[in-house]
Amino acid sequence: MIQNMAYRKLQVIRISFHNWEDFFSIINKYPEKGADKMKQFKIIATAASGMEALVGKELRDLGIECQVENGKAIFHGDIETIATANLWLRTADRIKIVVGEFKAVTFDELFEKTKALPWEDILPMDAEFPVAGKSLKSTLFSISDCQAITKKAIVSRLSEVYHRYGRLPESGAKFPLEVALLKDHVTITLDTTGPSLFKRGYRLEKGGAPLKENMAAALVMLTSWRKDRPFYDPVCGSGTICIEAALMGHNIAPGFNREFLCEEWDWVDAAIFEKVRTEADAKADYDIKLDIMGSDIDGKMIQVAQRNAEEIGLGDSIVFKQMQLKDFTTEKEYGVIVANPPYGERLGEEEAVQQLYREMGETYRPLKTWSKYILTSDLTFETHYKARATKKRKLYNGALRTDLFQYWGTRPPRAPRVEKTEE
């Protein structure tokens, strides 16, 4: 009797299929939880212009070989590699899987080559898969048409594989895709990250012109700072630069307190992310004492910065203080100053900002052992600071071109070499 009931249930489930062969083909093709469908992937870590080399260095420090190109670093690996990159990369924007690459100069070619990709290995029948697009120097220049044709090709493939004769439900997990054309070369990618990597989850509030967390991390990484030396941000705002420095000082993975989109996918084993997070927690040095200070003339922003630091558990690692920039004095040596002052882009602000630059020069030039790094879009900064930078580096703060003016301090003396004596 039980067998007859089970058979009748299968008959009901099978109604939407033409025959038993179709039904069992779906059962066999649907991606399973933790299934090893695409063990090795070609992966892209996207980055803002000017930050690609930093992303490449981060990957190599993680033991991942990569190739750095404009706006991205390319590498290969499995799901654990993807989890590691999402969790640990401080300066990247997103981690994407390359689903396919090919040349296309006609819409028919784009359709057929997209349809030929093994979409059933990635997208379950109920997957929600929005398709973004971009095109540069390509025959197929209409982005909306490229998006529509790519979507149509994927739907056609999945409808055949899953034997669907109506619309795909798209009611399940989200799989954001992008079709990108560059000089007729098509790259289709799948985003594993979700909200951009700069969203660490600690910024409860922000100031008027906030610096993204990955940009703040890049500024710290471009300095000579080491965790045993003083670190100071004189215009700290909501505290982002100081918090990113503290995360590095404690060796805390920037993505430790957030989740990633691919964790919702059936073919991504939750145990892999749990393993990577456990290993990251073991690598963190929560007990080290750091000398990090942030100040701002706005007392309300100091309160915001303190709350943000406390949100991520770093309230005791950073000292925030309301203070005018010109009031900073110190007897400490070999510290690092990182500042992202107002740029004076708005009408009427230019003179006030230039006065701030002059105060920076008067306050910081006497600190011969300290290294100073100031980010601004004002290319005349050196004139107001009254000193030529040791080095300048072009960076993009969003779409805005900025320069990091670097003033290197004297190097600390080397520790005396201890000669080994023979016993």
Kindly label every feature range from the protein language model.
Residues 41-51, 55, 77, 81-84, ...:
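S-adenosyl-L-methionine
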